[in-house]
């Protein structure tokens, strides 16, 4: 009560009433009547515009504050659920409505702010359910109607309190959904004034915009409890169009190309959304709009979600985002791919991610598929290639089946799966297995050579069996089957024979998996008839799979699959593998990835890090065919030099540089001695093992952290020495930071202190847009490279996933290599783009040698950790 008395005394500008007046009902009524009479008199003077010597705004504010304090004291003195006499008097005879009408006029300035502050204070602090009273609802509707009309002329303080009032109303409706029909209008046409008042402020990049976005999301959640509001959102598409328009407008305001200073500071593979927005201020507005759109899509009912996603896809992605991704200018392409990469991370595990994937997988621009255009940029030069690699790294990290199927799985799974099945089946002539024949009705006419050797059957005949005789018998049997005669002398190919063959092969398990409508009918008496029935079954299965796989894309299956007849002349695993080309191409992405791995010696270190990260993530998937394609030296799908062989080549190049320059190792020791601040003896000594730097820097390659024994075993497999820097010709300790890095950190800290205030991303974005993923950090830390689809394999993989210390070493070295300096004399290591920093502690006469020494150190660490990563992935996948 003492606090209430002091506030009342301050509001009156003098001594407050006595305690007896506030404790008694009669005293509160007298104070309330006096304040209300003075308020009416002040409003009358403002409306008639009489000449007066006092400030009417200040007087009205004092009287409203006194009324509120009396109402608060009255509520504290009565029981819960009861209405006091003063509040009951205020809610009758339209007294509250008349006060609102008098203070919502244009003149004098500040009257609206006084009324908004009073009504917000009453609704926020009084426990009585005021919204159930018609007087309060009428006053609120009048306030919303007037301020909607004059929203462009609102002062900043008025707009802020107005948004707080609307947010308070939405939160009250969320707690009491039964009051929602009171805010819905049916005549003259259906309307929801509360939502209509919020939408114009959604695109504001101020605190008012943040409050408006939060209130709109709350309104969308109310639609789950009100069928009337859900039908309103379905009938009025203007809401979905405004959500898509806000996103398109924010993206259109982004710079089409990153500034030169930002391009030098921004490494597309190392920064998240918050770090990006610090260097590109307008990016924060786009990320806020993207987060808001994702929150709305998740909050609305499922019936409204499809409408909003369709508007976003056509109104933003196809019309704005798609043309920017197909820009020919390198600077604009780099900016668009950076925006897309961070957008994918911001919308992870949300329905909006499906719309982005639909754009990448199923959209064309000027006759070119979007995904193919992005794959083509992998082989470009400079930042465009690095940004494209980082984008595909983010795509693969999503572990989306549609993306992986489009990129690689559909090109490697089918041929190698056929080969594995052919190697494990029994001899063909003894049983009838049309399902394993590869749908090849003419084995004697092979593609390219015109000859056929049944290697699959010959492998099971034994060492003393004549292969040519077995192949000839197999051909004759298949020819008899085409003519409708069984090799054992039967007159036809009956369903009984097929049943026996399948029963012998799968022990009735396969028959239990075959649907009834796809069972082979006894009327199919020829092999051609079986092929025709099997073709129809395959088409039906493909259509069903496409409907399931592309359901969130909202596409019809025939738009994706097309209508292709079954090719019965295709090559099979029984044909000559050396003379017949592969059944399917390896695909544009895998072909490009293969070419990039063959040229690892020509790339810079950053490109090799991103490339090796993509290869490691693909090799960690539980798909043996893909792992063999990427890592197995004896895989038939690999042409040319493999990825593992490139690791050996990089290793040999490092050793060659050390052997060519006799003083290189000594200069390396001198460089490290100058960096660590102590003198190293001139004679050769073994350096301590490589340790992680103290700072928790995040590297661009998320690799596996395994034990010393497992890493040594992995290194021995690829004929590399263990992970001890003492065993390296130039191995050194990396425990202390370099002077250049300390100077760079100090310079960066001073620049951060001097930087003006910039737009920030909404606080709720990190927790609501992607399930607790904070975009201020590198996206590498949120995902494990070895995560897979199955629960058991995911459990095994999670036990060994972490950021390796040498990865952080590589990241720190990359930061120093990015400084301006002359090129290195070693083109084999990509020296045209990566150079080393100058060290003031050492003389200018050995700078070139020190640069080469630092380059060798980084590549050595890269090769060792990458080899361990690749081989640990292979061993882990085999254990699965």
Curated annotation (Swiss-Prot):
Record region (Disordered): 437-471, 677-805
Stretches that traverse the bilayer: none
Superkingdom: Eukaryota
Compositional bias segments (type: Basic and acidic residues): 744-758
Low complexity composition bias: residue spans: 448-467, 687-697, 733-743, 783-805
Pfam families tied to this protein: DUF5917, KELAA, RAI16-like
Stated family: Belongs to the FHIP family.
Protein name (record): FHIP family protein 36947
């Amino acid at each position: 009560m003492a606090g209430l008395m002091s506030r009342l005394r301050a509001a009156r500008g003098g001594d407050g009433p006595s305690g007896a007046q506030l404790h008694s009902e009669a005293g509160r009524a007298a104070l309330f009547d006096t304040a209300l009479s003075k308020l009416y008199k002040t409003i009358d003077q403002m409306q008639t515009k009489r000449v007066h010597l006092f400030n009417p705004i200040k007087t009205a504010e004092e009287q409203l504050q006194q009324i509120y304090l009396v109402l608060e004291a009255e509520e504290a003195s009565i029981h819960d659920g009861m209405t006091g006499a003063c509040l009951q008097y205020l809610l009758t005879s339209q007294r509250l409505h008349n006060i609102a009408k008098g203070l919502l006029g244009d003149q004098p300035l500040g009257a609206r702010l006084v009324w908004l502050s009073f009504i917000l204070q009453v609704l926020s602090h009084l426990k009585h359910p005021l919204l159930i009273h018609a007087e309060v609802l009428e006053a609120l509707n009048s306030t919303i109607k007037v301020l909607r009309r004059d929203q462009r002329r609102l002062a900043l303080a008025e707009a802020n309190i107005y948004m707080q009032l609307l947010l308070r109303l939405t939160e009250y409706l969320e707690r009491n959904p039964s009051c929602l029909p009171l805010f819905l209008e049916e005549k003259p046409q259906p309307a929801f004034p509360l939502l209509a008042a919020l939408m114009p402020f959604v695109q504001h990049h101020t605190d008012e915009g943040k409050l408006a976005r939060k209130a709109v999301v709350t309104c969308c959640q109310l639609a789950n409890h009100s069928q009337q509001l859900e039908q309103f959102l379905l009938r009025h598409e203007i809401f979905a169009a405004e959500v898509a328009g806000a996103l398109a407008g924010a993206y259109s305001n982004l710079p089409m190309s990153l500034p030169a200073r930002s391009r030098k500071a921004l490494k597309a593979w190392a920064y998240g959304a918050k770090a990006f927005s610090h260097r590109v201020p307008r990016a924060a507005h786009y990320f806020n709009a993207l987060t808001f759109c994702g929150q709305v899509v998740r909050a609305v009912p499922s019936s409204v979600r499809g409408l909003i996603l369709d508007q976003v896809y056509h109104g933003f992605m196809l019309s704005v985002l798609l043309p920017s991704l197909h820009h020919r200018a390198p600077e604009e392409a780099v900016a668009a791919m950076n925006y897309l990469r961070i957008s994918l991370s911001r919308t992870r595990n949300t329905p909006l991610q499906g719309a982005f994937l639909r754009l990448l997988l199923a959209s064309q621009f000027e006759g070119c598929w979007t995904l193919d255009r992005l794959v083509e940029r992998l082989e470009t030069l400079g930042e465009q290639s690095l940004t494209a690699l980082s984008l595909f790294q983010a795509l693969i990290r999503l572990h989306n089946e549609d993306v992986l199927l489009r990129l690689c799985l559909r090109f490697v799974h089918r041929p190698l799966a056929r080969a594995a099945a052919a190697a494990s089946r029994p001899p063909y002539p003894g049983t009838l297995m049309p399902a394993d024949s590869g749908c090849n009705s003419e084995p004697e006419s092979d593609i390219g050579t015109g000859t056929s050797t049944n290697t699959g059957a010959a492998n099971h005949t034994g060492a003393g069996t004549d292969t040519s005789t077995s192949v000839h018998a197999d051909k004759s049997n298949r020819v008899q089957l085409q003519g409708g005669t069984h090799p054992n002398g039967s007159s036809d190919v009956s369903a009984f024979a097929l049943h026996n063959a399948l029963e012998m092969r799968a022990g009735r398990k396969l028959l239990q998996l075959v649907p009834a409508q796809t069972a082979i009918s006894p009327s199919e008496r020829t092999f051609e008839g079986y092929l025709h029935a099997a073709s129809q079954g395959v088409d039906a299965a493909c259509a069903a799979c496409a409907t399931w796989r592309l359901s969130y894309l909202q596409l019809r299956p025939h738009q994706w699959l097309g209508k292709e007849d079954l090719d019965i002349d295709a090559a099979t695993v029984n044909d000559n593998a050396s003379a017949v080309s592969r059944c399917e191409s390896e695909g544009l992405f895998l072909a490009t990835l293969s070419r990039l791995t063959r040229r690892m010696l020509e790339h810079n270190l950053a490109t090799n890090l991103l490339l090796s990260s993509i290869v490691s993530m693909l090799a960690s998937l539980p798909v043996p065919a893909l792992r063999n394609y990427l890592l197995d030296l004896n895989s038939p799908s690999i042409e040319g030099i493999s990825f593992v062989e490139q690791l050996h080549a990089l290793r040999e190049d490092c050793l060659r540089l050390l052997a060519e320059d006799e003083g290189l190792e000594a200069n390396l020791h001198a460089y490290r001695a100058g960096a660590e601040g102590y003198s190293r003896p001139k004679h050769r000594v073994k350096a301590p093992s490589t340790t992680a730097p103290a700072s928790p820097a995040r590297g661009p390659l998320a690799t596996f952290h395994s034990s010393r024994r497992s890493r040594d075993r992995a290194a021995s497999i690829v004929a590399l020495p263990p992970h001890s820097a003492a065993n390296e010709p130039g191995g050194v300790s990396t425990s202390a930071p370099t002077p250049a890095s300390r100077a760079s950190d100090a310079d960066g800290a001073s620049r951060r202190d001097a930087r003006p205030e910039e737009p920030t991303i909404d606080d709720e974005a990190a927790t609501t847009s992607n399930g607790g993923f904070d975009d201020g950090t590198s996206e590498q830390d949120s995902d494990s490279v070895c995560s897979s689809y199955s629960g058991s394999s995911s459990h095994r993989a999670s036990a060994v996933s972490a950021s390796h210390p040498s990865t952080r070493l590589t990241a720190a070295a990359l930061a120093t290599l990015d400084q301006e300096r002359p090129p290195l004399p070693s083109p084999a290591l990509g020296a045209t783009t990566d150079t080393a920093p100058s060290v003031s502690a050492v003389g200018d006469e050995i700078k070139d040698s020190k640069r080469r020494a630092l380059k060798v150190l980084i590549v050595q660490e890269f090769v060792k950790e990458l080899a361990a990563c690749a081989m640990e992935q292979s061993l882990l996948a085999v254990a699965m």
